[in-house]
Amino acid sequence: MSSRFSRFVFTLSAGFAGAVAASAELIPSANNGGITLPAGFHAVVVADGLDGVRGVAVAPNGDVYGRQRGGGIVALRDTNGDGVADVKEMIAEDQPGGSGIAVHDGYLYYSTNSEIYRRARAAGELVPGGAPELVVSELRDRRQHSAKMFTFDDDGNLFVEVGSPSNALGEPDRARGAKGVSDEKVAEFLSEFGGVWKFDPRQAPQTQDEGEHWSTGHRHILALAWNPVSDALFGGMNGRDTLDVINPDLFEREYNAIRVSEEFHELKKGSNLGWPYTFYDPIDDRRLFGPEYGGDGEKAPAPDRFQDPIIDFPAHWAPMQLTYYSGEQFPQTYQGGMFLAFHGSWNRQGDQKGYNVSFIPFNASGKPTGEWSVFADGFMGKGQIASPNDAAYRPMGVATGPDGSLYIGSDHNSRIWRVFYTGE
């Protein structure tokens, strides 16, 4: 396991061979559109003034799609190669808003909070000509942690995460003195929530109950991506809140602010990530019981009961979309790795943290090395902030383009950036 803070930054100097420069026609925006990047990287603002873009997807021809929180999908096309979208269309405006979106196997897929839809998209079509087709329905939705993100494996199987509408299944939830529910109630709850379900889109339409229950013990995972080298599913989980509220005698506010990691896992069939019973402490590098289940800051589960994270990211950073970097434009160090958008904290003590896009390197076998670094930063704006509303931007979406550019979306002061590499 990794990510003690000593691993916060790793050396990139060894991997800058093998990069393919971006098109010379791309013109960086002033100050890279308000974000900071490593040397040799630049950003152009593809589109601005959008309506709360959540997930981002890029088609093989470079068209960009953003799933909007308030409803519909924004479709963007750059016709002159300067990186800025000069054609904007809206899709699915009559359907509820959502978060998940992907271009896969001739279709544009997108989610609401309870369904997955797709529309057939012929090559070169900005607005898919196909009618909406229901792929998965009856995905559980109880408001809290209801967003549905998804990804595909190389065989075309669809993996959908169903979040847990709770902090830690305490009664009453998030309240002082809350007690955890029985093991039987936890098992019943996790049969419907807090896991990934696997579907075959060729068998559409299906319901959640017809899917294969792949993994369990999640609080909420929006960051899902498939690694084609290791043939494995990876995800970043949003950790729990309010340790100090549940039992302030044992957990101080500062403890809650720094000791509940955002866990990065390989999601194997049968993986159990330990929610609602536990959280992972990134300072002491260990899994501990939460106060609802007898936790006192020392009590730990049996070593093999729950899966430990590969990386324990800092507390409350809020991992959102995750993308596998399949391109060759960026230096070799980045090739075959993953980029993860962190939305940023909203309720931690003191200044808020996160608000970046981080890079996770993988080895030649498609396994995470356990290291990570902040790749794109500056979304928070100048100085520290006390509230997310004070941030300039909040990274939400991230996707790899066909030329190896990286696209980043913000749902606050909503815009999409295209990050490219020139080496200069």
Where in the sequence are the language-model features?
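Structural WD40 beta-propeller signal
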Residues: 49, 59, 104, 151-155, ...
